Regions:
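Central regulatory/effector-binding core of bacterial HTH transcription factors
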Residues: 1-62
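C-terminal regulatory
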Residues: 44, 58-174
Length: 174
């Protein structure tokens, strides 16, 4: 048995595309998959493999990159932009709704960080919708509830991604 812990995002981008082929190719290996967006002590919980995004590691853990770096984008629906206009610069965002993300690990809301010619900007925006789930955030964007953040690979997984209009691409964080 191979015990794997990974975030939902890591499951969607890394494991899901390869799982069926792996199981067919190695029928004698049983996989136990734990999908959890919180912090997991891989050693204490006796996992064989953990997949997370970021660069914070527990002691005694070895990390290897599995993906190339990607950008976090801002997206809105055409209906939202028709009602509220398209922001052009960070100062415009104070007149828009942010679909926020709350960390499951510490209950903090992820600040909106943008990049302006190498300078990091923290932008305060009002928001009606906050979630700890990328599908809820994508649904909020899709339904015109505000401007939301999605990592580019998550945007690429959306079956109707043409409905997600990129906003202020020159300020996206890499």
């Amino acid at each position: 048995m191979v015990r794997i812990t990974l975030s939902r995002f890591a499951y969607l981008l890394i494991l899901k595309p390869a799982m069926a082929e792996f199981c067919q190719q190695y029928p004698g290996i049983q996989l136990e998959i734990s999908v959890y967006d919180g912090t997991v002590n891989i050693i204490k919980e006796r996992f064989d493999l953990g997949i997370r995004f970021g660069d914070i590691l527990e002691g005694g853990v070895v990390a290897r990159p599995l993906m190339k770096p990607f950008r976090e984008g801002l997206y809105a629906s055409s209906a939202y932009l028709s009602r509220h206009g398209t922001p052009e610069v960070p100062a415009d965002l104070c007149h828009h709704q942010l679909i926020g993300y709350r960390f499951i690990t510490n209950n903090r809301i992820l600040p909106l960080l943008l990049n302006d010619r190498g300078e990091q900007l923290t932008v305060e925006m009002p928001g009606q919708l906050i979630s700890n789930d990328i599908d809820v955030m994508a649904d909020g964007i899709r339904n015109g509830l505000g401007i939301g953040r999605l990592f580019e690979p998550v945007w690429q997984l959306q079956p109707d991604r043409e409905r997600f209009i990129p906003v202020m691409e020159r300020y996206w964080k890499k």
